[in-house]
Amino acid sequence: MEKIIEESKQGESLVLENKPENTKKLFIESYGCAMNFSDSEVVASILSDGGYNTTSVLEEADLVLVNTCSIRDKAEQTIRKRLEKYNAVKRTNPKMKVGVLGCMAERLKSQFLEEEKIVDLVVGPDAYKDLPNLLAEVEEGRDAINVILSKEETYGDISPVRLMSNGITALVSITRGCDNMCTFCVVPFTRGRERSREPQSIMAEIQDLWSKGFKEITLLGQNVDSYLWYGGGLKKDFVNASEMQKATAVDFDQLLEMVAVGFPKMRIRFSTSNPQDMHESILHVMAKYPNICKHIHLPVQSGSNRILKEMNRLHSREEYMALIDKIRAIVPDASISQDMIAGFPTETEQDHQDTMSLMEYVKYNFGYMYSYSERPGTLAGRKMKDDVEEETKARRLQEIVDLQQKHAWFRSEEFVGKTVEVLVEKVSKKSKDEFSGRNSQSITVVFPKENYKIGDFVNVKITSCTSGTLKGEAVGLSSMN
């Protein structure tokens, strides 16, 4: 659940710069979290070397891949509908091959290949380098599957091919997997245990992005704050590392500082943070460097200590609130966003009110809110009865959404009259005469184009707002240019 999901990007097909020598066409769609979109860029890079150019036209594809999400039942149902669409096209183009990547691949491998026979290959999140071999199997008329989870794989040696439509912002994966066995979450089972990527490969990827004109990167992982490089391997095995490995290990605040110092004119974001792993040292690094964005995505899921324990969250309500207090003290201009689940098994009205009161305490800038969706294979799915009525879940979720909307207005109004630095990302959807970008706090800002261009850092004085957007007038370029 702890993933930033951009609803506007769901199902976006990845179209990249083509190589003239490539003769085959790849159609790849992504669903779910930012990690899936990042992984699709890795996959496109691997297949580009194997003779594939990307296309946005499904009907002309030789190979169709969908990068899948298992976090909610709704996500899986959406992907199943897409698979039906792919197979309808395949009936008129029988040479087309269809494959499933990502979390559903690991979870439903046998069902897809053997029982329903709706795909030709199934590839888990740690097996993308094996795609050329798996495609060779498919060409020989055999089903192909690799969902083995790795202790080492981070794709640190793959240079992802980037989306050509923006060229300003990019995702940089730094960790894979998760060790926090939350009872509602499939991630540890579909993406494996935590392991971190070698720092120099991260720095090299960012250097490559900088040389190509990118202005902002997001350091990405299921749990970025627990980043720990000690020479490779699972984080849980760090206790067995040598004294030299322990002495030279790099943790997240050290990595964050390395990137901030190495690329002072590049904006740096990171996601996602887990409350128990966000230490004060990280906050001090954020406060020290102006190019580190002042936004923290800090999922809590519930404000009830009893429900947090049922979820196997490794923090209490009080510990979370104390962390919020630290953030406000050390990084006072930071925005904070949340993930929240309504209607977790056994949740009472008092548990729900505890969530509402926590939200009142924090007053989040924005959030990602869901009603509980039982996921097969999770501890909650195996051991807990989904006993909260759907009608009750829906009501509680709406109350959470309504309260978040109120707080978003409150936080947006705090910016009115202030001048904020905005990285121009695109032309506004609502007006071709306006630019749209985000400020350091990850809030969308819209302002008249004038003579500015995409990729500029512009100081904008905020004159009005909605709950999700700030509006203003440009007052000049910022010192980040």
Swiss-Prot record:
Note the SS bond partners: none
Record gene name: miaB
Q: Which family does it belong to?
A: Belongs to the methylthiotransferase family. MiaB subfamily.
KW Nucleus (keyword) present: no
What keywords are assigned to this protein?
4Fe-4S, Cytoplasm, Iron, Iron-sulfur, Metal-binding, S-adenosyl-L-methionine, Transferase, tRNA processing
Does Nucleotide-binding appear among the keywords? no
Q: What does this protein do?
A: Catalyzes the methylthiolation of N6-(dimethylallyl)adenosine (i(6)A), leading to the formation of 2-methylthio-N6-(dimethylallyl)adenosine (ms(2)i(6)A) at position 37 in tRNAs that read codons beginning with uridine.
Protein name listed in UniProt: tRNA-2-methylthio-N(6)-dimethylallyladenosine synthase
Listed Pfam families: Radical_SAM, TRAM, UPF0004
Q: What is its main location?
A: cytoplasm
Give the subcellular location.
Cytoplasm
Q: What is its EC number?
A: 2.8.4.3
**Alphabetized PROSITE patterns for the sequence:** MTTASE_N, MTTASE_RADICAL, RADICAL_SAM, TRAM
What range(s) does the Radical SAM core domain occupy? 164-411
